[in-house]
């Protein structure tokens, strides 16, 4: 390069650097404005969320707020109130990035006191610049966004409305936010709490809840997935495939085409368990039960036996086979021997317990007649009785005639044969003062004989 061209090159380089510096400065300003705008948009969204929560709170408590406000005296809603009632999350801060605190002032409409209107106003903290207020007023999406520039009046975005703060009993200063909630807005909020929504609204389960009875006007509820209720009253039929009940099922009557299975007892308070067509009660496990197949007999299923530790009682009891007893047969009625009876073959007893049988139309004692036994017996033995007889039916005697002992000089007495109350025999003879017991030997001591006669 020639020396006379070097000055121009330096000038060109300096100009380029100047342009670059100007572009950097301009870009930095643009970036700063962008960051500020994003921050103000975020603040506007937070104000919108707060205002939406206040709107819902007013709608749900519309009647209460009517009673606590007038056209000049407001009911004031704070952030704490919205958090405590669940309209704002517990993590929502009490102030914004500039330290301003939001409150809603609710008053009655002057022209129509039955309606409510409200204004959300920020107070305290650091004032926003006008540029920020204008930007945020346009970005607020709930209610009519605005701002306070003179400390007395709330002005809407694009200066679309202007309202004195005193109309709502509110106080604030320059550089603060204001949001107007009109009577229409709050009436809609009140209707939201009363309207049943067809679709789910996130965070608003109350919009899908009925707070009173609903009358379908005899119309149907179709394609219902599940019906959960405390009670149900039906004037017609209830049709279904299966049913599960954790409590009681009550009704005047019930008809089932197939089976009824119960996990517990089946009880009837005042009625019968009625079956038809030769059916009755059956124990499925053991195959026994009761049924009737004709008009006369209650039958045992599969000819099962009937077992009880108590009594079986009836007018007559008939056994087609043998009649067994594990103890005794007790006949309670008595008959009189010689009296008439029918039919032959009856068995009875008299008042002493003796067995009677009906023979040829007359009650007769069984095995009537007498029995006599005789024998020899030694001293000290008991007179025996015939088999099957008691002492009250018999009489007996003993004698010592087989070995008599006559009188001898100096002898006190002769032979002896007696018995006591227990039929114990004293048999022998006296030799002066000495008694000799009778034995079975054929010696001088001798032996006694007995005779026993018994009558049935």
UniProtKB/Swiss-Prot annotation:
Region (Constant region): 1-361
Keyword Cytoplasm: no
Signal sequence coordinates: none
Tagged with keyword Ion transport: no
Annotated region (Variable region), positions in chain: 362-456
Record key words, sorted: Plasmid
Other remarks on this protein: This protein is expressed by a shufflon (= clustered inversion region that works as a biological switch). The orfs of this region share a constant N-terminus, while the C-terminus is variable.
Protein name (Swiss-Prot/TrEMBL): Shufflon protein D'
Record organism: Escherichia coli
